[in-house]
């Protein structure tokens, strides 16, 4: 657990681990957190934007538009068929009060806070023995970024430019640092030396 007001950097999940976690959470009837992790990993949205989503925005559609809380910019998200199917499955199991309801509501009927989500994610990390040091809401966005980068490794500069735009970063250097690529490149330099 981190100290109050201290800063820790969220880590990303390996994509296959994230997908397995989404499936395990659903299998264990934890559809709310399964949906949270799926949306975070497949959209790259910040937690504040995920918590603001309502069912009518994401159910039975292949794309939706959000106005990002942090930047005020509009962003259109396309949902792939597997994610659409998972959203429908979660909707049927969660049984929200209506289509206008927020997607992530606590048992008390209020939208989860970021702090509560982070506590839940730490519990998930422990229960499912995730191999990740700092697992928080921001890990989902970083997992999205890392997967987009890894899928486009043959044209990594183009992938970084796309991610820079998606994340609303002012430079590719910021995106590289955000994804932890710079540190990895530095460490690989040491490995490339031979005796």
Question: Each PLM stretch: what is its role?
Answer:
Residues 2, 13-43, 154-155:
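Basic, Lys/Arg- and aromatic-enriched nucleic-acid-binding interface segment
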Residues 68-72, 167-192:
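Catalytic-site neighborhood detector that most strongly recognizes the C-terminal catalytic loop/helix
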Residues 131-151:
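Short basic/aromatic active-site micro-motif
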